[in-house]
Amino acid sequence: MSANYWHSTQCRFWSFTKEQLVTMRQKLEEDNAELVRMFPLPQQRRLYIYFNQQLIRLAKRLTIRQQSMATAQVYMKRFYSKVEIRRTNPYLVIATAIYLACKIEESPQHIRLIVTEARQMWGDLVAIDTSKLGECEFFMISEMRSQLIVFQPYRTITALRNELSLVDDEVQLARSVINDHFMTDLPLLYPPHIIAMVAILLALVLRPNNSGPGQSTSGAAAAAGLAAAQQALMRAQGQQAQGGMPEPAAAEPKEKRQQDRVSRVQKFAKWLVDSNVEIASMVDATQEIISFYECYEHYNDKLTREQINRFVKARGLDK
């Protein structure tokens, strides 16, 4: 085990470029062309959303910690970067990922309890027992080459909270963005600290002006906030390249809370320049998150579920 992300197996073996991921997935589809033709599936993002929802449902029944849930989601991404989805029962893979992640994160769950809860959730979709879960665990560990330690972005949020003067609402919103990023390719593309920086930036620009329990950001305000985030990053990137400080925005908002928010975003941009964070990576990751939120608006749970269940039953993977 490495205590340093840069020397970890996650950094050395499980960090890819977008082009590498595309190539890996294309090869899987080419190697399983007949299955792909017979059982069309929604685009990858929609599958991620569905798997995320199912994983959360099972995890809540087991009262599993967020860290273990996050690791389980990374395991699924790694596993399905090596194995064609249509050759597996995703429900068994979800249960296995949770079981394995809990052991690695030192909060183990009894295998019989996970089997029982999985049966109750997906009874007619997976004939799961302890031996099948154990076999799937061995399969998953083998495909991941026993490289099971996962560094998560949550730690960075905690470490920087005081330095960046983040309030409770901003920390909570940043953690929510991190939770959402597991439904994208970002865990396989960028280091955890980059994801954390993006989450903090989005928390600063998306937090409602009148923050209070149960209040949310309107669609128009969210769109404006995301645009502001991209603008701040581009400005910081330009200044970082020049070795200078980010310039303040030309126009000052009249509304005080909005002015305070812009000021905090500018201070964060200055902090990014001073800290030599890879702002280009942040720009790409921010765009990926924004693109995901746009995709989520059009997500069809019923269609996704039906297409997954169709190949599970047609191939006898529920037996």
UniProtKB/Swiss-Prot annotation:
It is found in: Nucleus. Coiled coil: none annotated. It comes from the Eukaryota. Residues 53-142 form the Cyclin N-terminal domain. Disulfide bonds: none annotated. Residues 237-251 have a biased composition (Low complexity). InterPro entries: Cyclin-like_dom, Cyclin-like_sf, Cyclin/Ssn8, Cyclin_N. Residues 237-261 are annotated as: Disordered. Transmembrane segments: none annotated. Residues 252-261 have a biased composition (Basic and acidic residues). GO terms for cellular component: nucleus. Keywords: Activator, Cyclin, Nucleus, Repressor, Transcription, Transcription regulation. One of its GO terms (molecular function) is cyclin-dependent protein serine/threonine kinase regulator activity. GO terms for biological process: regulation of transcription by RNA polymerase II. Belongs to the cyclin family. Cyclin C subfamily. Component of the SRB8-11 complex, a regulatory module of the Mediator complex. Interacts with SSN3/FCK1. PANTHER family: CYCLIN. Component of the SRB8-11 complex. The SRB8-11 complex is a regulatory module of the Mediator complex which is itself involved in regulation of basal and activated RNA polymerase II-dependent transcription. The SRB8-11 complex may be involved in the transcriptional repression of a subset of genes regulated by Mediator. It may inhibit the association of the Mediator complex with RNA polymerase II to form the holoenzyme complex. The SRB8-11 complex phosphorylates the C-terminal domain (CTD) of the largest subunit of RNA polymerase II. This is RNA polymerase II holoenzyme cyclin-like subunit. It comes from Gibberella moniliformis.
